[in-house]
């Protein structure tokens, strides 16, 4: 039992969620609420990052489950939180802060794919907008020699203000220079490039061909190196495509295996059957259970080499795993005569010799709501004992 569920609620998972479920939840939410896509959701993005940072670490998660957020803040597992952007970059393969200072920003896109796409391979065209260096001014922002050091911040891009907070006590506040917007330089409006308006970069449409190889997995990343946003003086970042697999109506993927449930009738479980299965590459395979091979309810069997192709070894495949659900006939489906005949065909049942010490009881259908109602009525009864309800009482003389 966990002390509180706030972090689990933020990620939209249950307290018993696996690491894979946590990763999938963080991936979807981080991409949805990233400041580049939702500038007004900075606090939400921070909450998502903090929740994942704690729950993805086994020691921090154990501490949180026992003591809640307060236990994390008190520093029992390292204390404090990392930068939300650093967590995002490390998760999506973008490196940390130092790497970002040398390179332009990576751009992350989520691409929805089907299980068929991952089985057969596919090619998708993705249209996106990216920053490229303005070719009119060659990334200068204006005429040659027009760029000058910002006199307001002296080229640092930051302003420092001293604020007195009490007698003999001052506070130093650092903020982005409003004159140059943190660039450390400025260009006179008359000298600015007409194409980029002094920003040095322009937006450009880019069409990417995304090749999805056979056997790729949900959450796998496809990286286009150097295709991210460009900035003067920096190496371009990457475009990272994250695959997001939709649920399939029949199959569930488990590593390299495919899992499915199959309903069969009692006669099929006892006497054998043949069942067709439509595969993800539009073939039809037929599975056979021969007469005399009893299939029990809940039995799990597999077909070799009919699972998912193995990534980069597409001629090798995992297993198709099938769990059988045996459907029994309804009450009264046989007449007494036929039931007697069926009994003779089946293995002999064991008879019970009744004694006087035995009691006959009736077997009835189970009602899962019965215990809930009994529990509710019991609470109401106890409440009446401790807090009698108002009403008419007998008078005593």
Curated annotation (Swiss-Prot):
For the modification N6-acetyllysine, the affected residues are 66
Residues given in the record as Zn(2+) 2 binding sites: 150, 153, 177, 180
Carrying Cysteine methyl ester, the residues are 394
Phosphotyrosine PTM sites in chain numbering: 381
> What GO terms are given for molecular function?
ATP binding; ATPase activator activity; Hsp70 protein binding; low-density lipoprotein particle receptor binding; protein-folding chaperone binding; unfolded protein binding; zinc ion binding
Q: List the record's Gene Ontology CC terms alphabetically.
A: cytoplasm; cytosol; endoplasmic reticulum; membrane; mitochondrion; nucleus; perinuclear region of cytoplasm
Q: Which SUPFAM superfamilies match?
A: Chaperone J-domain (SSF46565), DnaJ/Hsp40 cysteine-rich domain (SSF57938), HSP40/DnaJ peptide-binding domain (SSF49493)
One GO process term, biological-process aspect: flagellated sperm motility
Q: Where is the major localization of this protein?
A: membrane
Acidic residues: compositionally biased ranges:
353-365
- UniProt-listed Pfam families: DnaJ, DnaJ_C, DnaJ_CXXCXGXG
User: Zinc finger, CR-type: residue spans?
Assistant: 121-205
Assembly behavior: Identified in a complex with HSPA1B and BAX. Interacts with RNF207.
The protein, known as? DnaJ homolog subfamily A member 1
Show the taxonomic lineage: Eukaryota, Metazoa, Chordata, Craniata, Vertebrata
Q: Which gene codes for it?
A: DNAJA1
